[in-house]
Protein backbone atom coordinates (compact mmCIF):
# COMPACT_ATOMS: atom_id res chain seq x y z
CA UNK A 1 0.00 0.00 0.00
CA UNK A 2 3.01 2.31 0.41
CA UNK A 3 4.62 1.53 -2.95
CA UNK A 4 5.44 4.71 -4.87
CA UNK A 5 4.31 6.73 -1.85
CA UNK A 6 6.01 9.35 0.30
CA UNK A 7 5.60 10.03 4.00
CA UNK A 8 6.89 12.87 6.17
CA UNK A 9 7.14 13.49 9.90
CA UNK A 10 6.91 17.23 10.52
CA UNK A 11 7.70 18.93 13.81
CA UNK A 12 10.33 18.94 16.54
CA UNK A 13 12.68 16.34 18.00
CA UNK A 14 9.78 14.07 18.99
CA UNK A 15 8.96 13.77 15.29
CA UNK A 16 12.61 12.97 14.67
CA UNK A 17 12.51 10.38 17.45
CA UNK A 18 9.41 8.84 15.86
CA UNK A 19 10.94 8.60 12.39
CA UNK A 20 14.08 7.03 13.88
CA UNK A 21 11.89 4.33 15.38
CA UNK A 22 10.20 3.73 12.03
CA UNK A 23 13.56 3.57 10.28
CA UNK A 24 14.77 0.90 12.70
CA UNK A 25 11.68 -1.17 11.90
CA UNK A 26 11.80 -0.71 8.12
CA UNK A 27 15.52 -1.36 7.77
CA UNK A 28 15.00 -4.89 9.05
CA UNK A 29 13.48 -5.53 5.62
CA UNK A 30 15.27 -3.07 3.35
CA UNK A 31 18.16 -0.67 3.75
CA UNK A 32 17.32 2.84 2.50
CA UNK A 33 19.49 5.42 0.79
CA UNK A 34 19.89 8.81 2.41
CA UNK A 35 19.01 11.12 -0.48
CA UNK A 36 18.76 14.49 1.29
CA UNK A 37 19.77 16.32 4.43
CA UNK A 38 19.91 19.96 5.39
CA UNK A 39 23.07 21.59 6.71
CA UNK A 40 22.42 20.53 10.31
CA UNK A 41 21.01 17.08 9.45
CA UNK A 42 17.72 18.00 11.12
CA UNK A 43 15.63 17.57 7.96
CA UNK A 44 16.41 14.36 6.10
CA UNK A 45 14.98 12.10 3.40
CA UNK A 46 15.50 8.38 2.80
CA UNK A 47 14.51 6.32 -0.22
CA UNK A 48 13.70 2.61 -0.17
CA UNK A 49 14.40 1.47 -3.76
CA UNK A 50 12.70 -1.95 -3.63
CA UNK A 51 9.52 -0.49 -2.16
CA UNK A 52 9.86 2.80 -4.05
CA UNK A 53 8.94 4.45 -0.77
CA UNK A 54 10.25 7.84 0.39
CA UNK A 55 10.46 8.76 4.07
CA UNK A 56 11.27 12.25 5.36
CA UNK A 57 11.61 14.13 8.60
CA UNK A 58 11.09 17.89 8.33
CA UNK A 59 12.45 20.04 11.14
CA UNK A 60 9.89 22.69 12.05
CA UNK A 61 9.65 22.87 15.86
CA UNK A 62 7.13 25.73 15.92
CA UNK A 63 5.32 24.86 12.66
CA UNK A 64 5.29 28.65 12.23
CA UNK A 65 7.77 30.88 10.45
CA UNK A 66 10.47 31.56 13.01
CA UNK A 67 14.00 32.72 13.55
CA UNK A 68 15.87 30.49 15.99
CA UNK A 69 19.25 31.32 17.50
CA UNK A 70 20.53 27.96 18.75
CA UNK A 71 23.59 25.85 18.09
CA UNK A 72 23.62 22.07 17.57
CA UNK A 73 23.54 21.49 21.34
CA UNK A 74 20.43 23.62 21.78
CA UNK A 75 22.28 26.51 23.43
CA UNK A 76 20.51 29.79 22.58
CA UNK A 77 22.40 32.98 21.78
CA UNK A 78 19.25 35.09 21.49
CA UNK A 79 15.46 34.93 21.94
CA UNK A 80 13.60 33.25 19.06
CA UNK A 81 11.12 35.20 16.95
CA UNK A 82 7.79 33.62 15.99
CA UNK A 83 5.50 34.93 13.28
CA UNK A 84 2.11 33.80 14.55
CA UNK A 85 0.31 34.57 11.29
CA UNK A 86 2.72 32.72 8.97
CA UNK A 87 3.36 29.00 8.68
CA UNK A 88 6.89 27.73 8.26
CA UNK A 89 7.76 27.54 4.54
CA UNK A 90 10.19 24.72 5.37
CA UNK A 91 7.26 22.31 5.55
CA UNK A 92 4.54 24.23 3.69
CA UNK A 93 6.59 24.38 0.47
CA UNK A 94 7.12 20.61 0.57
CA UNK A 95 3.63 19.60 1.66
CA UNK A 96 2.44 18.83 -1.88
CA UNK A 97 5.23 16.24 -2.25
CA UNK A 98 3.87 13.99 0.51
CA UNK A 99 1.12 11.37 0.39
CA UNK A 100 1.11 10.91 4.17
CA UNK A 101 2.23 13.19 6.97
CA UNK A 102 2.46 13.07 10.73
CA UNK A 103 2.55 16.54 12.24
CA UNK A 104 2.48 17.99 15.74
CA UNK A 105 3.81 20.59 18.14
CA UNK A 106 5.29 20.39 21.60
CA UNK A 107 7.66 21.67 24.23
CA UNK A 108 9.32 24.31 22.07
CA UNK A 109 6.39 26.59 22.78
CA UNK A 110 7.45 26.76 26.44
CA UNK A 111 10.55 28.69 25.40
CA UNK A 112 10.97 32.40 25.87
CA UNK A 113 9.99 33.96 22.53
CA UNK A 114 9.05 37.20 20.81
CA UNK A 115 5.67 37.01 19.05
CA UNK A 116 5.02 38.83 15.77
CA UNK A 117 1.91 39.43 13.69
CA UNK A 118 1.91 41.40 10.41
CA UNK A 119 5.69 41.65 10.88
CA UNK A 120 5.11 43.69 14.05
CA UNK A 121 6.01 42.54 17.53
CA UNK A 122 2.82 42.00 19.55
CA UNK A 123 4.26 40.57 22.75
CA UNK A 124 6.60 38.15 24.40
CA UNK A 125 6.34 34.92 26.32
CA UNK A 126 8.36 34.56 29.52
CA UNK A 127 10.44 37.73 29.29
CA UNK A 128 9.38 40.03 32.16
CA UNK A 129 12.48 42.16 31.76
CA UNK A 130 11.20 43.38 28.39
CA UNK A 131 8.71 46.25 28.16
CA UNK A 132 6.32 44.20 26.02
CA UNK A 133 2.84 42.76 26.28
CA UNK A 134 3.03 39.48 28.18
CA UNK A 135 1.48 36.61 26.21
CA UNK A 136 1.15 33.05 27.43
CA UNK A 137 2.59 30.22 25.33
CA UNK A 138 -0.97 28.96 24.79
CA UNK A 139 -1.67 32.05 22.66
CA UNK A 140 1.04 31.04 20.21
CA UNK A 141 0.27 27.33 20.41
CA UNK A 142 -3.37 27.81 19.47
CA UNK A 143 -2.38 30.03 16.55
CA UNK A 144 0.12 27.43 15.33
CA UNK A 145 -2.24 24.45 15.58
CA UNK A 146 -5.21 26.36 14.16
CA UNK A 147 -3.23 27.64 11.15
CA UNK A 148 -1.60 24.28 10.51
CA UNK A 149 -4.87 22.34 10.46
CA UNK A 150 -6.63 25.01 8.41
CA UNK A 151 -3.86 24.87 5.81
CA UNK A 152 -4.09 21.08 5.57
CA UNK A 153 -7.88 20.88 5.32
CA UNK A 154 -8.16 23.74 2.81
CA UNK A 155 -5.27 22.65 0.57
CA UNK A 156 -6.06 21.25 -2.89
CA UNK A 157 -3.42 18.61 -2.20
CA UNK A 158 -4.87 16.00 0.14
CA UNK A 159 -2.10 14.32 2.12
CA UNK A 160 -3.46 11.78 4.59
CA UNK A 161 -2.62 13.47 7.89
CA UNK A 162 -1.95 12.15 11.38
CA UNK A 163 -2.19 15.04 13.81
CA UNK A 164 -0.07 13.94 16.77
CA UNK A 165 -0.91 15.20 20.24
CA UNK A 166 1.68 16.48 22.73
CA UNK A 167 4.06 14.23 24.61
CA UNK A 168 4.55 14.75 28.37
CA UNK A 169 8.01 14.44 29.88
CA UNK A 170 8.87 12.60 33.10
CA UNK A 171 11.37 14.86 34.86
CA UNK A 172 11.11 14.58 38.63
CA UNK A 173 12.48 16.98 41.27
CA UNK A 174 13.45 19.54 38.64
CA UNK A 175 13.53 20.20 34.92
CA UNK A 176 16.13 19.23 32.31
CA UNK A 177 18.33 22.19 33.30
CA UNK A 178 17.70 22.17 37.07
CA UNK A 179 18.67 18.66 38.09
CA UNK A 180 15.50 16.81 37.10
CA UNK A 181 15.82 13.08 36.59
CA UNK A 182 13.85 10.01 35.48
CA UNK A 183 15.01 6.75 37.07
CA UNK A 184 11.80 4.74 37.19
CA UNK A 185 12.04 1.22 35.82
CA UNK A 186 8.37 0.22 35.43
CA UNK A 187 5.36 1.88 33.78
CA UNK A 188 2.77 3.75 35.78
CA UNK A 189 -0.52 2.01 36.42
CA UNK A 190 -3.79 3.55 35.26
CA UNK A 191 -4.79 6.33 37.65
CA UNK A 192 -1.35 6.57 39.22
CA UNK A 193 -0.31 9.74 37.39
CA UNK A 194 -2.01 12.75 35.82
CA UNK A 195 -0.98 15.35 33.26
CA UNK A 196 0.50 18.54 34.69
CA UNK A 197 -1.17 21.89 33.99
CA UNK A 198 0.93 22.92 30.98
CA UNK A 199 0.36 19.58 29.25
CA UNK A 200 -3.36 19.79 30.00
CA UNK A 201 -3.42 23.27 28.45
CA UNK A 202 -1.70 22.05 25.28
CA UNK A 203 -3.97 19.03 25.04
CA UNK A 204 -7.08 21.19 25.42
CA UNK A 205 -5.98 23.35 22.50
CA UNK A 206 -5.13 20.33 20.36
CA UNK A 207 -8.46 18.61 20.88
CA UNK A 208 -10.48 21.80 20.38
CA UNK A 209 -8.68 22.82 17.20
CA UNK A 210 -8.71 19.29 15.81
CA UNK A 211 -12.48 19.05 16.34
CA UNK A 212 -12.99 22.32 14.45
CA UNK A 213 -10.73 21.24 11.60
CA UNK A 214 -12.25 17.77 11.34
CA UNK A 215 -15.73 19.27 11.12
CA UNK A 216 -14.65 21.33 8.10
CA UNK A 217 -12.65 18.52 6.46
CA UNK A 218 -14.88 17.40 3.59
CA UNK A 219 -12.22 15.08 2.16
CA UNK A 220 -11.63 13.21 5.44
CA UNK A 221 -7.83 13.35 5.26
CA UNK A 222 -7.34 14.26 8.92
CA UNK A 223 -6.89 11.77 11.76
CA UNK A 224 -6.14 12.35 15.45
CA UNK A 225 -3.03 10.45 16.50
CA UNK A 226 -3.37 10.59 20.27
CA UNK A 227 -0.10 9.57 21.90
CA UNK A 228 -0.46 11.62 25.09
CA UNK A 229 -1.87 9.02 27.47
CA UNK A 230 0.36 6.28 26.04
CA UNK A 231 3.38 8.46 26.74
CA UNK A 232 2.22 9.53 30.19
CA UNK A 233 2.24 5.94 31.47
CA UNK A 234 5.85 5.22 30.42
CA UNK A 235 8.33 7.02 32.72
CA UNK A 236 10.61 4.01 32.29
CA UNK A 237 11.17 4.53 28.56
CA UNK A 238 13.58 7.49 28.45
CA UNK A 239 17.35 7.46 27.81
CA UNK A 240 18.08 9.50 30.95
CA UNK A 241 21.84 10.11 30.96
CA UNK A 242 22.32 8.06 27.79
CA UNK A 243 21.15 10.64 25.29
CA UNK A 244 24.71 10.37 23.96
CA UNK A 245 27.03 7.34 24.00
CA UNK A 246 29.31 6.85 27.03
CA UNK A 247 28.03 9.84 29.01
CA UNK A 248 30.30 9.21 31.99
CA UNK A 249 33.48 8.50 30.06
CA UNK A 250 36.20 11.06 30.81
CA UNK A 251 33.80 13.25 32.76
CA UNK A 252 34.74 15.41 35.69
CA UNK A 253 33.13 13.61 38.65
CA UNK A 254 31.73 16.91 39.90
CA UNK A 255 30.14 17.78 36.56
CA UNK A 256 26.57 16.60 36.12
CA UNK A 257 25.42 14.75 33.02
CA UNK A 258 22.34 16.25 31.37
CA UNK A 259 19.42 13.83 31.51
CA UNK A 260 16.82 13.27 28.81
CA UNK A 261 13.38 12.44 30.22
CA UNK A 262 11.40 13.54 27.16
CA UNK A 263 12.63 11.50 24.20
CA UNK A 264 12.38 7.72 23.96
CA UNK A 265 14.84 4.85 23.94
CA UNK A 266 15.07 2.69 20.82
CA UNK A 267 13.74 0.09 20.99
CA UNK A 268 11.17 1.48 23.37
CA UNK A 269 7.64 2.78 23.92
CA UNK A 270 7.70 4.94 20.79
CA UNK A 271 7.82 1.79 18.64
CA UNK A 272 4.19 1.20 19.61
CA UNK A 273 3.29 4.46 17.88
CA UNK A 274 4.25 2.90 14.56
CA UNK A 275 2.16 -0.18 15.28
CA UNK A 276 -0.83 2.07 15.93
CA UNK A 277 -0.16 4.18 12.87
CA UNK A 278 0.03 1.14 10.61
CA UNK A 279 -3.16 -0.26 12.12
CA UNK A 280 -4.94 3.03 11.39
CA UNK A 281 -3.69 2.98 7.79
CA UNK A 282 -4.73 -0.62 7.22
CA UNK A 283 -8.24 0.09 8.47
CA UNK A 284 -8.77 3.06 6.15
Where are these regions (language model features)?
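A compositional signature for long Ser/Thr(±Pro)-rich, low-complexity
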Residues: 1-284
